[in-house]
A protein has these predicted regions:
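Extracytoplasmic thiol/disulfide redox context detector
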Residues: 2-133, 184-201, 206, 228, ...
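Cysteine-centric redox/oxidoreductase cores and disulfide-bonded domains
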Residues: 129-237
C-alpha cells in the first residue's frame, strides 16, 4: 500500500514538475523583452533557412488561389498543339516561358525528365515573350506551328539551336515546316494577349513561371521542386 502511495506521489511530483516547467517557459516567452524574442526568431530562421521561403510560398499561394480557381480552364487548355504528355492527364503543369530566357532553357531538361518519368502528366506551354523582338517572333512562330500540330518540332529544335535570332528561328521553322516569318493571325495575337493578362494576374515578374494545382512557382525551381508539387496535387486527389 505504501509502495503504491509512494509511486503515486512520485508520479504526481514528476507531472507537477513538468507542468511547472512548461508554465515557467510560457511565462518567460510572453514576458520576454522584444529584442530577445526577435533574436530567438532570427536564430530560428538562421538554423532553418527554408522557413522563410516556405512561408512566402504559402502566402503567395493563398493570394493567388482565387485567380487560379477562376482561370483554371484558360490556364490548362492548350493553344493548338502547345502541350506534351498525357492526352487524359492526372496532373497538368503549366509553364509560361520565353525562348530567350536562360532560366527557361535551364529548366527544360527538368521538364522533359518529368514527362519521361510520369505518364499521367501533361505540360501546357504558354508563350510569354518579354525579352525582345526575337522572342516575339519566336513565340508567334511557335503558335503558328502549334495551329498546324507541329509545336513539338519547332519548340524542341529552337531550344537546341540556341537563343532566338533570325538564323536559329529559321532552323526551327524549317523543322516544323512553316515559313520563317510570322503571319498576321488574330488568334495568335489573342493568345499572346491572354497569356500576358494571366501572367500579370498571377504576379509574374519574369520567366519561367510554373503552375500546378494551387501552386505558382517563379524561376528555375528545379526538378525536385516540380516533382514535389506534382506529388502534392496527386495527394490532394
Amino acid at each position: 500500500m505504501n509502495e503504491k502511495r509512494g509511486s503515486s506521489l512520485m508520479t504526481a511530483a514528476i507531472a507537477g514538475g513538468l507542468i511547472g516547467s512548461l508554465l515557467t517557459a510560457a511565462l518567460l516567452i510572453f514576458a520576454m523583452p522584444e529584442y530577445l524574442s526577435s533574436r530567438i526568431v532570427r536564430q530560428g530562421m538562421l538554423a532553418n533557412p527554408n522557413i522563410l521561403s516556405e512561408t512566402v510560398d504559402a502566402l503567395r499561394d493563398q493570394q493567388y488561389a482565387p485567380v487560379l480557381a477562376s482561370n483554371r480552364r484558360a490556364l490548362e487548355t492548350p493553344f493548338g498543339s502547345s502541350w506534351k504528355g498525357a492526352e487524359k492527364p492526372e496532373v497538368t503543369l503549366v509553364e509560361f516561358y520565353d525562348y530567350a530566357c536562360p532560366y527557361c532553357k535551364a529548366s527544360n531538361p527538368s521538364v522533359d525528365r518529368l514527362l519521361r518519368e510520369d505518364p499521367g502528366l501533361r505540360i501546357v506551354y504558354r508563350e510569354l515573350p518579354i525579352l525582345g523582338p526575337d522572342s516575339v517572333v519566336a513565340a508567334r512562330l511557335a503558335l503558328q506551328a502549334s495551329k498546324q500540330g507541329r509545336f513539338g518540332q519547332f519548340h524542341d529544335t529552337l531550344w537546341k539551336a540556341g537563343r532566338p535570332a533570325p538564323q536559329t528561328i529559321a532552323v526551327a521553322a524549317q523543322a516544323a515546316g512553316i515559313p520563317a516569318q510570322p503571319v498576321k493571325d488574330p488568334a495568335i495575337e489573342a493568345e499572346l494577349k491572354s497569356n500576358f493578362q494571366l501572367a500579370g494576374q498571377l504576379g509574374a515578374t519574369g520567366t519561367p513561371v510554373f503552375i500546378v494545382g494551387d501552386r505558382v512557382m517563379n524561376g528555375a525551381v528545379g526538378y525536385e521542386a516540380l516533382k514535389k508539387a506534382i506529388a502534392d496535387v496527386r495527394a490532394k486527389g
